[in-house]
Amino acid sequence: MLDKVVIANRGEIAVRAFRAATELGAKTVAVFPHEDRKSEHRLKADESYEIGEPGHPVRAYLDHEDIVRVAVECGADAIYPGYGFLSENPLLAGACAAHGIPFIGPPAPALHLAGNK
């Protein structure tokens, strides 16, 4: 069972993931860029961490290293990417594997193959 999950997404996608994680008994962690500091997903999570640099909100959600850093710092048991952003990117799945953090999604090799069309 997971105790704490980083949701690497925003908006309604993140809010629905928080709801599911909470129903399973897990604490939730939001990541957000400066521009999303008043967003609902940040306020609905049990914990939230600012990522990225001001002026580049989308880039923040694509920074797999920063997201993994947050997971390590907050002691998360897993990272869930939602969809879009890093959900189909093998870099996040690979970084999770390298840090021993479960990635809730396909493994990096599968994502790499799926993206090589």
Go through each PLM region and give its residues:
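N-terminal beta-alpha lobe that positions the nucleotide/phosphoryl donor
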Residues: 1-117
